[in-house]
């Protein structure tokens, strides 16, 4: 008799995706981040659901409802901080996942990669609207500054901003719709993640060497299920260390002050995971130019397959490209640091140089280096 998991219509899908899936035998821990992102998403949806039961999306009561969750709701504080720090873990996993894709040439799977870039944009949008909900000072001013960037769009900009605000400033209508967006977007992310997996399973996973591994496959279960569970335990450990010992480490103290439209904080800055893009935005003195640079800094990922000039897929055997990759990582860390600094000398010039280097590495240096490596190998 055939096993039920291979015949039942629903079980068959699960079986083909997580149990009998043929996987390369040599994929490293860098391949864990996909499943960790799935865990993060489930965790965020669950904690978010319980927070939504007590949260009120009204400008008068939003801040106090979050305070009420932390003080009066049973284990409300842990749910709130798991949700806030869970977002940080989500982005750490996202950056690792994208970095792995760049290093090992995963972007050659075009559909999977492009859906991934759309997912990245969607997660960033979700995190942004979510940050507005506690209605603290940084929530309010962050929403005002970032939505205002759309006014740089020629002709329709101002109308577009007022349409998003639902009025002439960030107010009750804005908060209510941002709560609605924040509630629906994670389910859209879940649907997109399924499409992401669907396209991935059409081609099968890449492996560190970049060489096809059709002749050397192993079943996903038990090998990679166990490996994923280990990753999950480490993720939960790190998250709970943050939540229980330093819940506000990654947050902004200004967000513990209720939103006040009459008082601007001295340094308006987003959460840490947006600082690299914020630094690129600020490094250009022109508003429209800054917005274009901001969008390009993420959208540039879509160009990766076009910029791949190497005859090898992975960077595993390409030492010069490896050096460039790690310089790019260091550059992104520098941008993250600059994004959190005030707009003054020497931070302005460092930010501008780091922004130029970011685009230079991806658009010029990496393709040129790959071509040089091809010639060195006499290919």
Swiss-Prot record:
The chain crosses the membrane at residues 33-53, 77-98, 113-133, 178-198, 226-246, 288-308, 320-340, 347-367. Its cofactor is heme b. Component of the ubiquinol-cytochrome c reductase complex (complex III or cytochrome b-c1 complex) that is part of the mitochondrial respiratory chain. The b-c1 complex mediates electron transfer from ubiquinol to cytochrome c. Contributes to the generation of a proton gradient across the mitochondrial membrane that is then used for ATP synthesis. It is found in: Mitochondrion inner membrane. One of its GO terms (molecular function) is metal ion binding. Heme b b562 binds at residues 83, 182. The keyword Transmembrane applies. This is Cytochrome b. Heme b b566 binds at residues 97, 196. Heme 1 (or BL or b562) is low-potential and absorbs at about 562 nm, and heme 2 (or BH or b566) is high-potential and absorbs at about 566 nm. Belongs to the cytochrome b family.
